Swiss-Prot record:
Subcellular location: Plastid, Chloroplast thylakoid membrane
One of the protein's GO biological processes: ATP synthesis coupled electron transport
UniProt catalytic activity: a plastoquinone + NADH + (n+1) H(+)(in) = a plastoquinol + NAD(+) + n H(+)(out); a plastoquinone + NADPH + (n+1) H(+)(in) = a plastoquinol + NADP(+) + n H(+)(out)
Function: NDH shuttles electrons from NAD(P)H:plastoquinone, via FMN and iron-sulfur (Fe-S) centers, to quinones in the photosynthetic chain and possibly in a chloroplast respiratory chain. The immediate electron acceptor for the enzyme in this species is believed to be plastoquinone. Couples the redox reaction to proton translocation, and thus conserves the redox energy in a proton gradient.
InterPro entries noted in UniProt: NADH-Q_OxRdtase_suN/2, ND/Mrp_TM, Ndh2_N
EC number(s) stated in the UniProt entry for this protein: 7.1.1.-
Membrane topology: Multi-pass membrane protein
Species in which this protein is naturally found: Liriodendron tulipifera
Name of the molecule in the record: NAD(P)H-quinone oxidoreductase subunit 2 A, chloroplastic
Catalytic class of the enzyme: translocase
Segments crossing the lipid bilayer: 24-44, 57-77, 99-119, 124-144, 150-170, 183-203, 227-247, 295-315, 323-343, 347-367, 395-415, 418-438, 484-504
Gene it is expressed from: ndhB1
Length: 510
């Protein structure tokens, strides 16, 4: 009898929850239509996997890619609509949020074809991989549109949990297990620090959780210049710093890059930074509006440390993935310049433009690492010596992406950095921009060193790995080459196409 009553209560509670969710989607579903497409894609993946055999594997890739493309299309159709706040103030849709969501979807769309051959060769579980990628993408999109402190905390946890699982996907690999453990421990600690910072904001604002209402609450309570706000700023900066991985919050990055499967590293290296940058701009610009001098100083210190340490340590690396890990630390220092500049001198527009180019440059480089690693089983920089003699396409595309990362003209990376540094210079960040220019020169050195190795070999000799290198037929690795071609084209956009890109980015103001 007791069991029967409990069962009825469970059914009633479940029905109420379902009806509440249906009501929210019915009246607010249009606000999160791109996210709903991904949710539908996730459900479809689970249904097909549970009812099909190995012959339907291509359908899994097709459904995942189609869901992402349809979500991008839905975002583009919604472009230039009036800003809207939905779900009782928890979620906001505007051009600024949507362009970051577009960047995250673009990353995921490029990463799936990049992963196909790797998954087949390593015999990884395909469905789970695609589910984690789509779920992480969904979490990143919700983080971009988050409008209150609770959603800002929960959304990155959705992204982070999938990231931990993806990082440890090759369970038999000791390095992967070590990387996942470090990633999980650091991620858990940073989440605790972040929520502690939000608790200080919550108390200081009189119990408000929405970003704009926190500002109004701080004015009412006269706490906007209190020590509690400074404490909240420090804790939140440290918490967000883990996601952005600037120095000195970068300790996990090289180990995770080296130990995780290469397609996973490619995915995490761009999506996490895009989502965290979107969140950081809103958090610093709105709740900490009255503490702009303080958070500007904090971010300047992080940017300087990141640009110097990231680029200097990258010179000493022998692993290609570890080198890109430290390179990404330096790159996030450049992005932070745009966050500091803000709206006043097109800082956000320059940051968005540079991140768009960074996605193509970085994913193009990782596509080369995936392709070479599958043929040789190594990612040691010295083992790339003389690759041009065996695979000219791979060597040339790698060279273009690396040169663009270094910021050499007339490639896209040069114009992205130029606009970013110019906006910083106009905002009076002379020292920060000078450090950025100097460290960019340092980065060119280690990129050119790799390119020289690719083209001429070490002492005019090729390594045994390259000597035994066998390029697969086009039909077997066309997915990686497709991603690489798209990324190379995007990395070599001439300066003439910068103006429309910057104009679109300038429409993303709050």
């Amino acid at each position: 009898m007791i069991w029967h009553v409990q069962n009825e209560n469970f059914i009633l509670d479940s029905t109420r929850i379902f009806m509440k969710a249906f009501h929210l989607l019915l009246f607010h579903g249009s606000f999160i239509f791109p996210e709903c497409i991904l949710i539908f894609g996730l459900i479809l993946l689970l249904m097909i996997d549970s009812t099909s055999d190995q012959k339907d594997i291509p359908w899994l890739y097709f459904i995942s890619s189609t869901s992402l493309v349809m979500s991008i299309t839905a975002l583009l159709f919604r472009w230039r609509e009036e800003p809207m706040i939905s779900f009782s103030g928890n979620f906001q849709t505007n051009n600024f949020n949507e362009i970051f969501q577009f960047l995250i979807l673009l990353c995921s769309t490029l990463c799936i074809p990049l992963s196909v051959e790797y998954i087949e060769c390593t015999e990884m579980a395909i469905t789970e991989f695609l589910l984690f990628v789509l779920t992480a993408t969904l979490g990143g999109m919700f983080l971009c549109g988050a409008n209150d402190s609770i959603t800002i905390f929960v959304a990155p946890e959705c992204f982070s949990l999938c990231s931990y699982l993806l990082s440890g996907y090759t369970k038999r690999d000791v390095r992967s297990n070590e990387a996942t453990t470090k990633y999980l421990l650091m991620g858990g600690a940073s989440s605790s620090i972040l929520v502690h910072g939000f608790s200080w904001l919550y108390g200081s604002s009189g119990g408000e959780i929405e970003l704009q209402e926190i500002v109004n609450g701080l004015i009412k309570t006269q706490m906007y210049n209190s020590p509690g706000i400074s404490i909240a700023l420090i804790f939140i900066t440290v918490g967000i710093g883990f996601k952005l991985s600037p120095a000195p919050s970068h300790q996990w990055t090289p180990d995770v890059y080296e130990g995780s499967p290469t397609p996973v590293v490619a995915f995490l290296s761009v999506t996490s930074k895009v989502a965290a940058s979107a969140s950081a701009t809103r958090i610093f610009d709105i709740p900490f509006y009255f503490s702009s001098n303080e958070w500007h100083l904090l971010l300047e210190i992080l940017a300087i440390l990141s640009m110097i340490l990231g680029n200097l340590i990258a010179i000493t690396q022998t692993s290609m993935k570890r080198m890109l890990a430290y390179s990404s630390i330096g790159q996030i220092g450049y992005v932070i310049i745009g966050i500091i500049v803000g709206d006043s001198n097109d800082g956000y527009a320059s940051m968005i433009t540079y991140m768009l180019f960074y996605i193509s440059m970085n994913l193009g480089t990782f596509a080369r690492i995936v392709s070479f690693g599958l043929r040789t089983g190594t990612d040691n920089i010295r083992d790339y010596a003389g690759l041009y003699t065996k695979d000219p396409f791979l060597a040339l595309s790698s060279a273009l992406c690396l040169l663009s990362l270094g910021g050499l003209p007339p490639l896209a990376g040069f114009f992205g950095k130029l606009h970013l540094f110019w906006c910083g210079w106009q905002a009076g960040l002379y020292f920060l921009v000078s450090i950025g220019l100097l460290t960019s020169v340092v980065s060119i050195y280690y990129y050119l060193k790799i390119i020289k190795l690719l083209m001429t070999g070490r002492n005019q000799e090729i390594t045994p790995h390259v000597r035994n290198y066998r390029r697969s037929p086009l039909r077997s690795n066309n997915s990686i080459e497709l991603s690489m071609i798209v990324c190379v084209i995007a990395s070599t956009i001439p300066g003439i196409s910068m103006n429309p890109i910057i104009a679109i980015a300038q429409d993303t103001l709050f």
